Amino acid sequence: MSVLLQHQFKPLPADKQIDTCCFLDSVSHLPAFFDCFGSAIFSPIKADITGNISKIRSVYESNPSKFKTLQMILEGEKELHGPQWPKVGATLALMWLKRGLKFIQVMLQSIADGERDDQNPNLIKVNITKAYEIALKKYHGWFVQKIFQTALIAAPYKDDFLKALSKGQTVKEEECIEKIRQFLVNYTTTIEAIYIMYNKMNAELDYKA
């Protein structure tokens, strides 16, 4: 499962502070995940994630010591931007990024849990749909939702998707699933910590894209 395990997310410390540099290093490799779908139709999600990573990196590199953790970015921007916050800067970029990361997490967890369409067990549409409905749908307007429905038509077979995750190597499904579970441990913990942080700081926005 080279696409995922080559750049594992690190365990979080007890205080759940997320080191910005380590986070950016791990998350910067995730856009390649969408290449595993084998269709450019998923490129808008990939582009959105890539763009938001760049925005966060730009803020971090402007003052690495001040923005050492993601929590410090939100706190610093809240003080800097006043009433405009959280609709600005890296705070807004991370808000959207975490939703894209949640999409990946829910989809992979659904596959690892064995959820499938009994009529078409080798399709992953049910896993992608679940991830979209949980992580992204409520934040998308009618037009974007229609684009996603079109993308579903181009969803790959599970065998092809798992092979792509393994960088073209033929690996037993059980081995692929086990590697997905390994990846999800720290990845899920990190995403949950970001969501908790946004809720605690009242930084979550519900407007539609």
Swiss-Prot record:
Sequence repeats lie at residues 45-55, 56-66. Beta-D-galactosyl-(1->4)-beta-D-glucosyl-(1<->1)-N-[(9Z)-octadecenoyl]-sphing-4-enine binds at D48, I49, T50, G51, N52, I53, S54, K55, H140, Y207. It comes from the Eukaryota. The keyword Ribosomal protein does not apply. SUPFAM superfamilies: Glycolipid transfer protein, GLTP. Pfam families: GLTP. GO terms for molecular function: lipid transfer activity. GO terms for cellular component: cytoplasm. PANTHER family: GLYCOLIPID TRANSFER PROTEIN (PTHR10219:SF97), GLYCOLIPID TRANSFER PROTEIN-RELATED (PTHR10219). Belongs to the GLTP family. Accelerates the intermembrane transfer of various glycolipids. Catalyzes the transfer of various glycosphingolipids between membranes but does not catalyze the transfer of phospholipids. May be involved in the intracellular translocation of glucosylceramides. This is Glycolipid transfer protein. The lineage of its organism: Eukaryota, Metazoa, Chordata, Craniata, Vertebrata. The gene is gltp.
